[in-house]
């Protein structure tokens, strides 16, 4: 188990990550969420990550108070990622300890966290499943 304390994101993150652009429509974003089993996509502009868009952001488009006029579905689906993305988001670096990532995931209920380099370019994503695999491997080594 002590081995887990020394593990960093670099050895466990997914390096090939799908990204979206600010101009992507909600319709296309919805199709991507349906097709891919992801909860979030990094938003990329000129090779830099400028935000994060989640399934929750997409769902928020459909939340209305009783006093609001309900917009037409087609109008909602023409909105873009730029309209709903989170421009200030939590990310980690590849040298971040997995224990810190686990802490962030539990505290904020994240399923995944972007891994960004010093130039704000995407290096990968670290997901709950990656953390669980690392834990399982460390526990297996210490038991064996």
Predicted regions and their residues:
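Tandem CBS (Bateman) regulatory domains
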Residues: 1-16, 54-90, 97, 102-106, ...
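The conserved cystathionine-beta-synthase
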Residues: 20-37, 43-44, 91-109, 116, ...
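A glycine-centered beta-loop-beta connector
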Residues: 33-36, 41-57, 105, 113-130
């Amino acid at each position: 188990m002590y081995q887990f304390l020394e593990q960093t994101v670099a050895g466990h993150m997914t390096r090939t990550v799908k990204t979206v652009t600010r101009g992507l429509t909600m319709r296309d974003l919805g199709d991507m969420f349906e097709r891919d089993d992801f909860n979030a996509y990094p938003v990329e502009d000129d090779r830099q990550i400028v935000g994060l868009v989640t399934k929750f952001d997409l769902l928020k488009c459909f939340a209305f108070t009783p006093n609001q006029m309900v917009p037409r579905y087609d109008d909602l689906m023409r909105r873009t990622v730029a309209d709903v993305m989170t421009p200030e988001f939590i990310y980690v670096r590849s040298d971040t300890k997995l224990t810190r990532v686990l802490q962030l995931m539990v505290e904020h209920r994240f399923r995944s966290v972007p891994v960004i380099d010093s130039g704000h370019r995407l290096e990968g994503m670290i997901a709950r499943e990656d953390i669980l695999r690392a834990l399982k491997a460390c526990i297996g080594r210490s038991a064996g």
